């Protein structure tokens, strides 16, 4: 049995997230159907994280085990020929049998993109949160840095993840920055791991700070702002 690690990019817009859902098009489901068809039996494809519906990935990491002796580069080409155009395997490699893309990860980086100009191109709109309204971006950048360090992120988890018993909500954020480009605000965060909706809820909280609704910019608020739309979020990288 061979363990194969793949790095893939995808446009999350057409899909219902990463995780298999009966009757719905998901990244994991499509990969398992294709690889399982090549293997001649069901194959479980594990991912480094379960991106939500509409969230994009620049370099998601996944892994699966097969008996097929096909060289990894030929495997990459064969799977890409069968994948929809919105999903592409960037590279594939053989790894140790016990590798797990989620449990072996030591850090992940996400990026959230907000488009700030009044007119957003229709070719950019699917990949940004268009927010042309007034915001104090300096306040937002100050609060972004308060998320660095080890914290209990329970207020920033989705309600179903927030209520999960016995699961720690403590995460370590190594860096949390907000940068301005000519037309965009880009929030970039690198951490040990992330809860469901955590990055999008942090962005919603930064927006509340930009509106002047958060007084203390040097510590985490007791509650998050509204969850920012999924389409502005990108999984950038996973480190091992």
Swiss-Prot record:
GO terms for molecular function: RNA binding; tRNA pseudouridine(38-40) synthase activity. Substrate binds at residue 110. It comes from Solibacter usitatus (strain Ellin6076). Its EC number is 5.4.99.12. The keyword Cell cycle does not apply. This is tRNA pseudouridine synthase A. Signal peptide: none annotated. It catalyses: uridine(38/39/40) in tRNA = pseudouridine(38/39/40) in tRNA. The active site is at 52 (nucleophile). Homodimer. GO terms for biological process: tRNA pseudouridine synthesis. Belongs to the tRNA pseudouridine synthase TruA family. NCBIfam families: hisT_truA. InterPro entries: PsdUridine_synth_cat_dom_sf (IPR020103), PsdUridine_synth_TruA (IPR001406), PsdUridine_synth_TruA_a/b_dom (IPR020097), PsdUridine_synth_TruA_C (IPR020095), TruA/RsuA/RluB/E/F_N (IPR020094). PANTHER family: PSEUDOURIDYLATE SYNTHASE, TRNA PSEUDOURIDINE SYNTHASE-LIKE 1. Formation of pseudouridine at positions 38, 39 and 40 in the anticodon stem and loop of transfer RNAs. It is an enzyme of class 5 (isomerase). Pfam families: PseudoU_synth_1. Keywords: Isomerase, tRNA processing.
């Amino acid at each position: 049995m061979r363990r194969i690690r793949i790095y893939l990019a995808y446009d999350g817009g057409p899909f219902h997230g990463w995780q298999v859902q009966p009757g719905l098009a998901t990244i994991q489901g499509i990969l398992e159907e294709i690889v399982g068809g090549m293997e001649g039996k069901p194959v479980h494809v594990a991912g480094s994280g379960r991106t939500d519906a509409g969230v994009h990935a620049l370099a998601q990491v996944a892994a699966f085990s097969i008996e097929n002796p096909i060289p990894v580069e030929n495997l990459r080409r064969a799977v890409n020929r069968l994948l929809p155009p919105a999903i592409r395997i960037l590279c594939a490699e053989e790894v140790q049998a016990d590798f797990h893309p989620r449990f072996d990860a030591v850090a992940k980086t996400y990026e959230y993109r907000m488009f700030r100009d009044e007119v957003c191109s229709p070719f950019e709109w699917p990949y940004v949160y268009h927010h042309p309204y007034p915001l104090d971006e300096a306040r937002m950048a100050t609060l972004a840095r308060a998320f660095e360090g080890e914290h209990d992120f329970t207020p920033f988890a989705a309600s179903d993840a927030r209520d999960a018993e016995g699961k720690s909500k403590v995460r370590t954020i190594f860096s949390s920055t907000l940068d301005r480009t000519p037309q965009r605000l880009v929030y970039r965060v690198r951490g040990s791991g992330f809860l469901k909706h955590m990055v999008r809820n942090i962005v919603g909280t930064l927006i509340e700070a930009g509106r002047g609704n958060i007084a203390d910019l040097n510590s985490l608020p007791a509650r998050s702002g509204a969850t920012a739309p999924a389409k502005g979020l990108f999984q950038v990288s996973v480190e091992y």
